[in-house]
Amino acid sequence: LLLLTLTGLPLLFRGEINAWNTVNLPPRGEPMALSEIWAGLPQGTAAVAQAFPTKEILAVTPDGEDGTLYFRVKDRGGKAGRSHMRMGGEQIMYEVRTGTLFNRQERVYRSEAVQEFMHTMHILHVRLGLEEGGRDFLAAMCVLSVISIVSGVYLYLPMMKTLAFGTRRRRSSRLFWSDWHKLTSAFAGTWAALMCVSGVFIVLYSVGMRDYQRTAQTMAAEHFSAQEQSASLLLPEEALAQMQEAFPAKDIISMRLPTADSALYVFQIAEPTVRATDFALGTQVYLAAGGGEPFLVPVPAWLTMAPFFLNLHIPNHELT
């Protein structure tokens, strides 16, 4: 718990710290509806193709926080790095309002030490720097921590009933600090239990979502292999328009373009969120590169709890 607390504290303010530490980051815009951001897809695609002719666009993800489209790219003929939506890989930002481009690989840091520190805090917090083994170990320790907190309340609560909650005695310094300890431990224990429970679910979500995406990919391949495909190819904005027409009440939170290995557009759709920073659970929807009926693979029912736990765990310092 001490490790998770020490590493989690700077991560709470990762966005603010990274914004301060990146000296050439474009100014952030105001929040913007995802549908308005997607309206800039044709212009963004053209701008990226013109400015980076040697790059191939793999996926596009909107950021409702500041009205930006993230184009995940790779060198033509090259290999794409590990990535997920706006995380990882080579990402080119397109500011919809101004039409400006910024390649995130060209970021200049005020302090490389701060950047390295934040990266270290992240990998320690999520997996102890040990990949999946470290992640699973942290989940197991969180389970033990919750058991310890709950059992501690059960064991010590009867002994504390003789004293009203919040009472601070001043007869001696030992009693004074003991009462403060009881008061703060009630809040700290509750917070620790919430963070541990939500953290365990995040690990389960990570495993479950990976399995869901693999299953969805297999189901989509089988579904479209049994159909005759059109020889013509949809432009990204045409594929997007079909999805918006098919799912008008949903937000489109990601779009992956067809590749040599898969002639399918892969979209993630989600329920609209209250805030731009809220987590949105993506449901996989596939569309043939030549158009046709979309193929939706529902998310397992238990994964629908993910938004509650991830919003509780990650952006909990945002009170507005």
Predicted regions and their residues:
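Conserved histidines in hydrophobic membrane contexts and catalytic metal-binding motifs
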Residues: 1-320
